[in-house]
From Swiss-Prot:
A Pfam family per the record: Amidase
Keyword Nucleus in annotation: no
GO molecular function terms noted in the UniProt entry: ATP binding; glutaminyl-tRNA synthase (glutamine-hydrolyzing) activity
Record's protein name: Glutamyl-tRNA(Gln) amidotransferase subunit A, mitochondrial
Chief subcellular location: mitochondrion
Keywords: ATP-binding, Ligase, Mitochondrion, Nucleotide-binding, Protein biosynthesis
Subcellular location: Mitochondrion
Domain of life of the native organism: Eukaryota
Function: Allows the formation of correctly charged Gln-tRNA(Gln) through the transamidation of misacylated Glu-tRNA(Gln) in the mitochondria. The reaction takes place in the presence of glutamine and ATP through an activated gamma-phospho-Glu-tRNA(Gln).
Enzyme Commission number(s) of this protein: 6.3.5.7
Catalytic activity: L-glutamyl-tRNA(Gln) + L-glutamine + ATP + H2O = L-glutaminyl-tRNA(Gln) + L-glutamate + ADP + phosphate + H(+)
GO BP of this protein: glutaminyl-tRNAGln biosynthesis via transamidation; mitochondrial translation
Organism of derivation: Mycosarcoma maydis
Catalytic center residues: K94 (charge relay system), S181 (charge relay system), S205 (acyl-ester intermediate)
């Protein structure tokens, strides 16, 4: 018998906390806009044109590819092409992940000529496994955005059109965004140009594009996949994620990437990895065989009531209900849970991530490397360089973060956001009955039968926005920020999250996704559940 509380929750769209969510997002936007106005910054139309790309002359109807490196001699190390778990697998890499001797621009004019002299650890592992790396993909500038429209190369178009099998609609009123910030990586996977792609996920930048494009996207547990060679946006939140058409493919790639890395000080220790592996093995071994008619019997899945704010469009609900029904048919017990700090998570995320970005991006001064404006004298060159080379969204977040760290604002903004983050982490720990292998504090772990193993929620509040709506002049950032409202809590908690396609919306035909979340280090649990769910849904 289905849990009535869960079904009441997903039938009734809206909650008493939704207004709070909206106010939080608006406050971030208003604060940043006010700072921009006071500083009278102007964007450079030449540096941030929506028509300019450099794609080595290759026609790319989705504007997803920055560079084609298929013929590169550095595609894979000697011998890797003939062996390895990923032999013959084609891949694309987001342009904020370093690839030796190839442009790593972060889709920014600031790094338009930057070519690293080393591979990111994730890229090195892919090469060693025999991967054929073909493309560098477009993204929101420095990973900041939810629509992949904040790019020096222009917006990425969504290949998942239900009305055209041959390419983009070429109509801004109908054409949709691919999601951000890893929209280019999602687009090349959806278009069938590569088997999988790497993206980065700070607050939803892999999961949101996966949902909008109708593919699978994994944000790993923080620290499981090395960040060495990933251009920093927000160090305490950044992760390297995987996008592919199937959970099975994501699982294989993740197993290659999930390695301890001495280059990365935030890389999870071998001890924590071993403890997590033991937990995963215990949980999965307690489930029936995959050949069973109910392979998830005994699994408890929680649906948080706070994940249905008024911003959630009703067309998202039918595919979500099908996912709930699918899990129940697979034997899982689905129950309603509460994550009470969710309404405050969005504003906390934007304050914390912007504060970290303001520090990380201070290094781009036009002196040591990066874009430089020679016309301005002395210290004015610093301001002129950053004003010209950074896009509007990046400048806005730098200013918001800088303000939040000032002596006058620190207590009211950054400190409060950090407290909210701790509350979000406690909420997840209380809801999940699996021990957190990254901490020795068992007080934050639910040990009784009321806890759940996995959490399920809609991936996004709606299907992909149209390009016309997303790029409308004067469109407030709050509308874009709210797209992250369902993805940022798992990021603040450092937990793994897997976006799985759940089918198409009945009215507009565009993809809808659902997301599975579990305890830190339980990525394999999500992948195990996700494989069965994707098969059950036929997506």
């Amino acid at each position: 018998m289905r849990n009535r509380g869960v079904h009441r929750c997903i039938i009734s769209v809206g909650s008493s906390n939704a207004a709070h969510v909206r106010r939080c997002a608006v406050s971030c936007c208003t604060l940043a806009s006010a700072n921009l106005a006071r500083r009278d910054l102007t964007s450079s139309s030449a540096a941030h044109s929506n028509s300019g790309t450099f794609r080595d002359g290759r026609f790319d109807p989705y504007n997803a590819i920055i560079a084609d490196i298929t013929s590169s001699s550095t595609s894979s190390p000697s011998g890797a092409a003939t062996k390895g778990r990923l032999k013959g697998w084609t891949a694309a890499i987001k342009s904020n992940i370093c690839i030796r001797d190839h442009p790593t621009t972060c889709s920014s004019a600031m790094l338009q000529h930057f070519k690293p002299t080393f591979d990111a650890s994730a890229v090195s592992l892919l090469r060693q496994a025999g991967t054929d790396i073909r493309y560098i993909t477009n993204c929101d500038e420095f990973g900041m955005g939810s629509n992949n429209i904040h790019s020096v190369h222009g917006p990425v178009r969504n290949p998942a059109s239900p009305r055209s099998e041959s390419g983009p609609i070429w109509n801004l009123e109908e054409e949709r965004v691919a999601g951000g910030s890893s929209g280019g990586s999602a687009a090349v996977v959806k278009a069938g140009l590569v088997r999988f792609a790497l993206g980065s996920d700070t607050g939803g930048s892999v999961r949101l594009p996966a949902a909008y494009c109708g593919i699978v996207g994994l944000k790993p547990s923080y620290g499981l996949v090395s960040r060495w060679g990933l251009v920093s946006y927000a160090d305490s939140l950044d992760t390297v994620g995987v996008l592919a058409k199937t959970v099975e493919d994501v699982s294989v790639v993740h197993s290659v990437l999930s390695q301890n890395d001495p280059h990365d000080p935030t890389s999870a220790s071998q001890q924590a990895r071993a403890a997590a592996a033991t937990t995963v093995e215990t949980l999965i071994s307690a489930l029936p065989s995959s050949n069973s008619s109910q392979p998830l019997k005994g699994l408890r899945v929680g649906v948080p009531k706070e994940y249905f704010p008024v911003e959630l469009h009703p067309r998202v609900l039918p595919p979500f209900r099908r996912a709930v029904a699918g899990l129940e048919e697979l034997g899982a017990q689905v129950v309603q849970i509460t994550l009470p700090s969710t309404p405050s998570a969005l504003s906390a995320y934007y304050i914390i991530s912007s504060a970290e970005a303001s520090s990380n991006l201070a290094r781009y001064d036009g002196v040591e490397y990066g874009f430089h404006t020679p016309s301005a004298p002395g210290h004015h060159a610093y301001a002129a360089t950053r004003t010209t080379a950074f896009g509007d969204e990046v400048r806005k977040r730098i200013l918001l973060g800088t303000f939040a760290l000032t002596a006058d604002a620190y207590d009211n903004y950054f400190l409060q956001a950090s407290r909210v983050r701790a509350q979000v982490q406690e909420d997840f720990a209380s809801a999940l009955r699996i021990r957190n292998a990254s901490t020795k504090d068992d007080k934050l772990t639910a040990r009784d039968q009321e806890g759940v193993d996995v959490i399920l929620h809609p991936s996004a509040v709606d299907t992909a926005p149209t390009l016309a709506a997303a790029m409308q002049p004067g469109e407030p950032s709050a509308a874009e920020y709210v797209q992250d409202v369902l993805t940022v809590p798992a990021s603040l908690a450092g937990l793994p999250a897997l976006a799985v396609p759940a089918g198409a919306a009945s009215d507009d035909g565009w993809p809808v996704g659902v997301t599975l979340v579990s305890q830190w280090g339980c990525d394999e649990v999500l992948l195990h559940v996700g494989k069965h769910l994707q098969t059950q849904l036929g997506t």
